[in-house]
A protein has these predicted regions:
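Extracellular glycan-recognition regions
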Residues: 23-196
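N-terminal catalytic cores of secreted or lumenal carbohydrate-active enzymes
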Residues: 197-357, 361, 370-377, 381
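Active-site neighborhood of glycoside hydrolase catalytic domains
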Residues: 336-358, 365-465
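Aromatic/acidic polysaccharide-binding cleft in carbohydrate-active enzymes
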Residues: 456-539, 551-556
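Carbohydrate-binding surface patches
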Residues: 554-591, 621
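Beta-strand-rich binding/interaction modules
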Residues: 582-606
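C-terminal beta-strand-rich structural cap/linker in extracellular carbohydrate-active enzymes
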Residues: 608-631
Length: 631
C-alpha cells in the first residue's frame, strides 16, 4: 500500500534529513485576484469570543471547501522571527493544520470524533495521528495546500513542494491564526488567492458503440432486511428504485443447506459473516425479496459460495492449492452441484414466477481448473434439460482480478466448457493496492479484458475491505468512482455491483466500507446510507438504465473522466473531475436535448436541477447530464 510505505519512508526521512534545510525558489510573481484578505497585528486587540482571553483574532474564510482543492496564501512580507502562522483545516471527523514560521514548515493531522481520543488535556477529545516538518531557507511568500485525488495532501512554499502526507478524511472549512508575541508590534498580512476555472470540451461520439448495459446492484443481507420495520422495508424499496439498484446478487445458503433445500429461507440457519462481532447476517435466500426485485423490473443473480459438504467429494486429482496456498482437500461434485442449482431454479420459478437471470459457478472458492470446467458443463446441461435455457451462466469469480485473469486463461483451455459461459466476472479487491493511484490498475484490467476473450464482463463485488482505508469519507468514495469509470471504459462492464446493498454490523467501519445501506436501530429500523458510497454509485446507476449502450466520448483531459450512454430515446453523460481547478464544460455531440443535470459530491447527494448551459464542475465532483428524469 502506498501510504504504508509512505509512513515508513517519512519516518526514516524525518530522522535522516531533519537538519537538511530546503532552499526555496524566489517568491513567484502573483497576479491572480484575491478571494479574501487577512491582517494580523500581534499587539492589537484580543479576538472576540469565549475561552481564548488573549489570542490574536483569527481569520475565518467563509467558504465551503470542495472535495479536492488547491488553496494559496500570499504574504505581503516575510514572516517575522518567532511568529507562527497556522492554517487550520477542519472536517466532520478530523482536521489538519499547516504551520509556517520564518524557517520551518510543519503539518499535523488529528482526529476528534471519539471520546476514546481524549488524552487528558483540552476541552474536547482529539489525537494527533500524523506529523511531519521540514526546515527551509529563503523568503516564504506563498503557501499552497493541495488536497488531491491521490488520497494525499501536499504543501508548497513559493510553488515548490516541501511536504506530502496521506489524507483519507474530508475537509470542509479553513481558518488562519497567528501565534506571536503580544508585547511586540508585528504585522502579518496577505490574501487568499481566488481559485481559477479552466475551460474544457466534452465531445460525444455516438458512432462509437460499445457494451449494452444490464444494470447495477449488489448483495442484500436477508437477515438485515428482516430487521427492517414495515416503514423501513417500504423505504428500502424506494431507495433501490430511486437508485436503480435492481440487480440482486443473492448470497445464498451454502454450508448449512440441506440436500432437499428445505431450509434455504430459514433465518435460524443464517451464518455470521465475520466482520468484527457481527451477528448471523448472511447465506440466506428469500423468495419474497426476489419477488419485490422482479416487480421493480430487476433481475436475480444466484451464486453459491462454500458448497454444502454433501455437494463435494475428496480431491483425488493432482495436488492443488487455494489462493492462500492451502491444499484443496475437497472439491465440488459437478453433478450434485448442478442438481442443487436446478432445484433452486425450480423453487424460485414456483415462488416468484422466474428462475434467476444469471447463475454464477461459485463465489471466490478455489477449485482446480478441471473441476470448474466440469461444473460449467454439468450446470449448462442440467439447466437446459430442466427447461431453464434462458438462464445465463457467469464464470467463477475470484476475489482479485489477477486471479480472475488466471481463471479465465485456464478455463479457455477447455473450449467446450468456456463456450457454456455467457459472462466473465471477477471481484476487484486488489484495486485497493492502487487506491491512491487508480491508473496503475489499468494494466491489470486490460489483461482481464483480453483474458475474457469477448465475453461480457460483470464486476460482481466492489467495496473497500482493507482496514487502512475504512474511512467513510467522500475522498475514498471518489477513488471507487474512478474504478466504476474504468470498469465501464476498459473492461466494457455490463454490470457494476457493490459488495452489499444492505448489511447490519456492530463495528461501524464495516458498514461504511462494505455496504451501501444499513438498518438504523435508532430511527425505527429504517435503512440509511452508511457513507458516500451510495451517492457515488447513484451518479452512475440513476441515469443509466438496462439496455442502454455505452457510446464514445472524449475530453482531451486525463483528469476529466467521462462515460456516455444512449438508446433510441435517451442519452446520459457522466463526468468525474479528479483534479483542480474547476472546469467550465462545453458539451458537444449530443443528439438529444438534456432534461436535467445532477450534482454528486461532498455536499450534494445526487442533487437534480433542470439543465442549463455553462455548467461548472467542481474538483472531486461527479456531474451527470441526462434526458432521463430520475426520481
Amino acid at each position: 500500500m502506498r501510504w504504508i510505505v509512505l509512513f515508513a519512508s517519512l519516518a526514516v526521512a524525518a530522522c535522516a534529513t531533519a537538519q537538511q534545510a530546503v532552499p526555496l525558489p524566489p517568491p513567484p510573481a502573483t497576479s491572480a485576484p484575491a478571494a479574501d484578505t487577512f491582517r494580523f497585528v500581534s499587539d492589537g486587540p484580543a479576538g472576540p469570543g469565549w475561552s481564548r482571553p488573549d489570542e490574536i483574532a483569527r481569520k475565518y474564510f467563509h467558504e465551503n471547501l470542495t472535495a479536492l482543492f488547491e488553496r494559496t496564501l500570499t504574504l505581503d512580507a516575510a514572516l517575522p522571527q518567532r511568529a507562527t502562522l497556522r492554517w487550520i483545516f477542519t472536517g466532520p471527523r478530523a482536521g489538519l493544520t499547516v504551520e509556517l514560521t520564518s524557517s520551518r514548515i510543519r503539518i499535523a493531522e488529528r482526529y476528534y470524533d471519539s471520546m476514546a481520543l481524549y488524552e487528558g488535556q483540552g476541552n474536547f477529545p482529539e489525537k494527533t495521528t500524523f506529523t511531519d516538518e521540514r526546515q527551509y531557507t529563503g523568503d516564504a511568500r506563498t503557501l499552497t495546500v493541495i488536497a488531491d485525488s491521490h488520497l494525499a495532501v501536499r504543501v508548497l512554499i513559493n510553488g515548490q513542494q516541501i511536504l506530502e502526507a496521506p489524507l483519507l478524511f474530508d475537509l470542509t472549512r479553513h481558518q488562519l491564526m497567528l501565534a506571536a508575541s503580544r508585547t511586540a508590534h508585528q504585522i502579518v498580512s496577505g490574501s487568499l488567492v481566488k481559485p481559477n476555472i479552466k475551460d474544457a470540451t466534452v465531445t460525444i461520439n455516438e458512432s462509437q458503440v460499445h457494451q449494452t448495459m444490464l444494470g447495477f446492484g449488489g448483495s442484500p443481507s436477508i437477515a438485515a432486511y428482516a430487521e427492517l420495520s414495515d416503514q423501513g422495508k417500504r423505504a428500502y424499496w424506494q431507495i433501490l428504485k430511486r437508485y436503480n439498484l435492481l440487480l440482486s446478487r443473492e448470497y445464498p445458503m451454502g454450508t448449512e443447506l440441506k440436500p432437499d433445500l428445505s431450509n434455504l429461507e430459514d433465518l435460524a440457519d443464517a451464518t455470521p459473516h465475520y466482520y468484527g462481532d457481527n451477528f448471523p447476517n448472511s447465506e440466506l435466500s428469500s423468495f419474497d425479496y426476489s419477488r419485490h426485485v422482479l416487480d421493480l423490473g430487476g433481475s436475480v443473480i444466484y451464486e453459491l459460495w462454500a458448497l454444502p459438504s454433501w455437494a463435494t467429494v475428496p480431491n483425488n486429482g493432482p495436488h492443488a492449492t487455494d489462493t492462500w496456498n492451502k491444499p484443496i482437500k475437497r472439491v465440488a461434485n459437478p453433478n450434485e452441484y448442478a442438481r442443487l442449482i436446478v432445484t433452486y431454479c425450480k423453487k424460485a420459478q414456483a415462488a416468484t414466477g422466474s428462475a434467476p437471470a444469471i447463475v454464477g459457478i461459485e463465489n471466490e472458492v478455489d477449485q482446480p481448473p478441471e473441476v470448474f470446467s466440469s461444473m460449467a458443463l454439468a450446470l449448462r446441461r442440467e439447466l437446459d434439460k430442466a427447461g431453464f435455457t434462458a438462464t445465463k451462466i457467469h464464470m467463477a469469480d475470484a476475489s482479485f482480478m489477477f486471479l480472475g485473469i488466471d481463471r479465465a486463461t485456464e478455463l479457455r483451455k477447455n473450449p467446450e466448457a468456456w463456450k457454456t459461459l455467457d459472462y466473465s466476472a471477477v471481484h476487484e479487491y486488489d484495486f485497493q493496492e492502487f487506491l491512491a493511484n487508480p491508473d496503475l490498475y489499468d494494466a491489470r484490467m486490460n489483461q482481464m479484458h483480453e483474458a475474457a476473450d469477448g465475453k461480457p464482463f460483470l464486476a460482481t463485488e466492489i467495496c473497500i475491505n482493507d482496514p487502512h482505508y475504512q474511512e467513510p469519507s467522500y475522498r475514498i468514495a471518489l477513488a471507487v468512482a474512478q474504478l466504476y469509470h474504468k470498469n465501464l471504459t476498459e473492461l466494457d462492464a455490463v454490470a457494476l455491483m457493490f459488495c452489499w446493498l444492505l448489511l447490519d454490523v456492530e463495528q461501524p467501519s464495516f458498514a461504511g466500507s462494505r455496504s451501501l445501506l444499513a438498518p438504523d436501530r435508532t430511527r425505527s429500523w429504517i435503512p440509511v446510507p452508511t457513507s458516500f458510497q451510495l451517492r457515488v454509485m447513484g451518479a452512475f446507476s440513476r441515469h443509466v438504465v438496462k439496455g442502454m449502450q455505452r457510446i464514445g466520448v472524449e475530453t482531451g483531459d486525463p483528469d476529466l473522466l467521462a462515460t456516455a450512454f444512449a438508446d433510441a430515446q435517451n442519452e446520459t453523460l457522466v463526468v468525474i473531475i479528479r483534479s483542480t481547478p474547476s472546469r467550465r464544460l462545453d458539451l458537444q455531440g449530443a443528439s438529444h436535448a438534456w432534461a436535467e443535470i445532477e450534482h454528486t459530491g461532498l455536499e450534494d447527494e445526487n442533487s437534480v436541477a433542470p439543465f442549463r448551459t455553462g455548467n461548472v464542475i467542481q474538483p472531486g465532483e461527479i456531474l451527470v447530464l441526462s434526458t432521463i428524469k430520475a426520481q
